[in-house]
Amino acid sequence: MTTASAAVPASTSLPTGIWLRMYLRLFAVQGSWNYESLLGNGIAFCMEPALRLLPGGMTGQRYSEALGRHARYFNAHPYLAGVAVGALARAELDGVPPAMIERFRTALGGPLGSVGDRLVWASWLPLCSLIALGAFGFGARPILVIAIFLVSYNLGHFWLRAWGLRVGFQKGLRVADALGNPVLRKGPQVVGTAAALIAGAAIPLASSRLIGGGRVFAAEIILLAMVGGVLFARFGGRLEGWRLSLAILALLVLFSVIR
């Protein structure tokens, strides 16, 4: 029996306790961030529970070599770091040659960074903010507005970390297939467009509540947002979210003037 087959469970899944420790450590992946290794130390810290399964355990040579290898420079989006943690842990437990792991590790960081930035910072975060802003515009109390934002945003990245760790370990060196998942490939465009549509209603409603002094035509605002949705469904990928948002806001301003 090879060392790889002795180390990796037959089901290609981690024991529940190890998986849970790795998942919880993902929330501290940026805890040792620095300009020299960026997320490197955090990646090694998150992988460490799985590396204990290597032959010799924590006192073995493969454990110390793997830990040192992954504590070096690495950069990715922190919410998608679980993909790298799972895939690299699987590669180590499978006994993949160190040189191949290094090449794989180098190639993995860039895609995880760019996809994460577009999905989270440019799409999911604005969407959650605008949903909370819309709730404020409809009269929700400030504490409820804060709760709506925190719950919606945190549910998203809690799920993303868990998904990344699971799919990374399942796929191993073939994790590139997972990066073609519709959530990662089309998610930024869909979420970004939804954020643009919600902005057309949330911003005027919230502004009116803050400024006051005039009647709010909530039905008309919602109608314009629905018109934007129809336009997006009609033109699909040819219509960018930010252009649609500007068009809706322009229609709203024009309607307010002629009203």
Predicted features and spans:
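Soluble N-terminal domains of membrane-associated systems
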Residues: 1-97
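Helix-coil boundary and interhelical linker segments in multi-pass alpha-helical membrane proteins
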Residues: 59, 133-147, 204-215, 258-259
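Hydrophobic alpha-helical transmembrane segments and immediately flanking/interface helices
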Residues: 96-103, 210-236
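Transmembrane alpha-helical segments and their cytosolic interface motifs
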Residues: 103-136, 198-199
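Alpha-helical transmembrane segments
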Residues: 142-158
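Alpha-helical transmembrane segments of helical membrane proteins, especially in multi-pass transport
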Residues: 157-165, 181-212
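Juxtamembrane inter-helical linkers in multi-pass membrane proteins
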Residues: 167-183
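Final/C-terminal transmembrane alpha-helix of multipass membrane proteins
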Residues: 241-259
